[in-house]
Amino acid sequence: SMAAHIATREASDADLQALRRFAMRNSISATKAELSEYSDANIKFHQMILELSGNELLRSTADGLLMHMHVVRRRAMGESDRASRSVADHMEIIEALESRDAELASRLVREHTMRLHDHIEDRWTRLNNLDESKQRVIGAAAEKIKIKEK
């Protein structure tokens, strides 16, 4: 969100037009279910905003995080409407950048990122609940076996 905030000041109109063209070109991948391609483009979109900020420290720090998140993002894109929601988010972010609204751009990036966080947290919670449920079923089955053996 800091990079988007800075990019509203630092990015040229031509830079923002290039970002929009990139996002539009890659939004097709999301709609055609070419999700691995879209996931890669999604990472590149965020890297482009980091580059537009002109802040090398932000860019290098975030690049490491983006690469760690790559696998998570790729998997999440295939679930529910994550890809189409991501495309819509990107367009809103671009509009905020183009209008040079630093606060809005920053907020939209933060909300976009937190939606992925919330999605992952929800999936993790459901997986943990599923594991607990499986353990209860296995425990109950083991008890039945013990009773039958007696």
Question: What are these model-predicted stretches?
Answer:
Residues 20-27, 32, 44, 67, ...:
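C-terminal all-alpha effector/ligand-binding and dimerization domain
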